[in-house]
Structures are given as C-alpha cells and as structure tokens.
C-alpha cells in the first residue's frame, strides 16, 4: 500500500510518532531528534543547521563521501546572479574563497570542496554514519516511526541498525527513503500532459549541441558502415512527451594548464578508442586544440 505525501522542494520532511517494533531484538537502535538520509550538499547543510539549532542529529550516508556532486567533480557552479545565493550556501563559497585568499570562489576542485564540506561537519560536531543504506521504513498513520539500515559493504542481518527520530529528511539524490516510506514516485520524465505543463518531457535544446556536420558513421561518409559508438538509431520522440529513461551517469575530472599541477594520464585496461570517436570529431569540427 502506498501513502501519498506532500513533497517539498529538494527534500521531503516526514515526521515520526510512536515507535513500531521491527527486526529482531538484538538490532541496535539509535534515537535522535532528526535523522537525515543522504550525505549530499543538502544533507550536510540540513544536518549542520539542525545541530546549530540545538537538535540531536544523525546524518546517514550510504557511501563513504559527503557532499554529493559538489565534492564529486561538479566544480563549476551554475549560479546565474551570484547575489541570489545567500545563507549557508553563500558561506560555503566564501569558505572556498578562504582557501585561495579570496572573498569568495565559485569554481573549485573536489579536494577543496571536500575539505570545506568536512569543515561544516567538524564545526557542528555532526554524528555521521557512513556505509549505511536503508532497507525498510516503519510507517504508521502516514508517518515514519523508524528506519532500518544495513551496511552497504556487507548487507546482511548482522549489520542492521534501527534509527528512531522525531523527524526524517530525505536528502538523497535517489529518494530511497521516500520510496521505502511508500511515497508515490515516477521514474523517468513526465510528459507535459501529466500536470498540464509546458517544459516537461522531451525538449529540443538550442544549447550544448554538437556542431553541425559531425559525421555519425563509422567510416565517414559511408552509411553502410554503421553508426559510431553511442549513437542510437531511434526516432526522436515528440516534444513534451514522457518516457521511462533516466539521465546517464558519468565521471568528472579536473584538467589544468598549470604544468606544476599536471599529472600524466594512464591508459586504462580495456581502453576502446572507438568509444571516443564522436568526441574527437566534435573537437576537430570546433577547431579546438589541446597542447
């Protein structure tokens, strides 16, 4: 049975009530005012804020890193007008600036972002559980009473922990806590017709496109040779239509033209240059040069 809850932007806050017993009697139990699931930037800042307000807080992270995309390589911030950034977000960028002896800094490598995020954790003396992944949520009367966590490195009953809290906040990217709690969700992108909107579903972007004239065929100019790796022969769907697809995942890396900071690239095992042929052709078409 699913329970519908009203979502808030970025995360959903679910209030708990009296504990309902779950799991065996030997399962360790942690009890706090606020449990935050997901050590993303939102999760760290939510935990920091709650702790500074005098609440007992537990921050749960399924992996071993805090900060999400901010510390994972997304070092160029899409801010538009920087004066729109206030509060603790602004404090984060100003602390990044301290590293460079500047007032504020909007671009940064993962190492500096990680150190800055860990500073928030240290300043608030946050209790962080790493490698803990949700397996179940105990819900009564549409309220979360407790959640059960397993060790993501060794998922078995011997590693289970139960967390009781007055308030739960899902700050994960995937929304696993919400899903376990029975909140309805949609995988993919909704079409415009779902909510009578205009910017959902398939969109014909004018930005971030390949330059005109990049040949798609394995042998340039020869359709019979097949398509380059990564190109799908599917027909583009109608503008505004929905689907069940999700965004691709990728790894980010930092490059520099500072010789002192450069490190050599090592050729990975099973490297296949054919997977990057489209990139090479796009670079040539844009007349870019890499020294």
What would you call each of these model-derived segments?
Residues 130, 143, 245-249:
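Residues that flank catalytic or metal-binding motifs in active/ligand-binding sites
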Residues 138-162:
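Conserved beta-strand-loop-beta-strand element in the redox core of flavoprotein oxidoreductases
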